[in-house]
């Protein structure tokens, strides 16, 4: 039997909104952070930021099952939990929803803790001053990304009713008892965070840190989400203006999936396990799910060799 290993996915996360609408909307308790006085140097601040990156939830496989990336195989019945999730079974979704909710808000809490402490960070020389500004920009971007994911997962689509309840917006570090803000207000908060972050020139050599280009990409993505096509084009051009033709060759596309940093990759989380490790039953039998044939690439598409494993 043919085995398919999707290496690239495109899932419209917003389709989960109806299923997750009834989940518990309590903000998780504030995590215990280090003594505020302990964050005095850019090195310590960078370490706390790295912890926030590591806390970011990675449920890409679950999103692919809920989306249209995969279709079942004859082995699907052997992984009944994943099959139930694929079929939008309430029992499985009720397990996933609180994990996502708490996970993204945990990242936001860590970013808030870091941003609160950045005023006390002392710098010596221009290099440390630049690094301090980069850390602040990255923390705001990671916070915005977490809010954006929460919005796409737990709220209705923007174009259905932007004034409908969206998610809870944090305004201070610690526990808060607040109602959900409107989708429109959440988008405004995300846009404000990204607009502040994009002002900081930042082009890290390693792809695991959010760069200024990543902020521009998120601004374009947010504009598309909110139906602001003109803004999406403007920010999209800023990103495309930094590309070159080599990024769109077979070698360039293949480089996106290598472990080393690559200038054609806008951003990638540092992870230690494969997103899709759970799809395989065994090397001999094959996979529980296979790539949706409707998402296949024609032979002339340079992405085919890297995105689909025959």
Q: What spans do the regions from the language model cover?
A:
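Sec-dependent bacterial lipoprotein signal peptides
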Residues: 1-21
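Hydrophobic-face positions in mid-chain alpha helices that act as interaction patches
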Residues: 233-310
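Conserved, well-structured interaction surfaces
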Residues: 81-153, 199-203
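Inward-facing hydrophobic residues that define packing positions of alpha-helical scaffold repeats
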Residues: 108-111, 187, 194, 236
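Membrane-proximal, proline-rich intrinsically disordered regions
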Residues: 22-66, 304-308
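Short coil/linker segments at helix-helix boundaries
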Residues: 127-132, 153-188
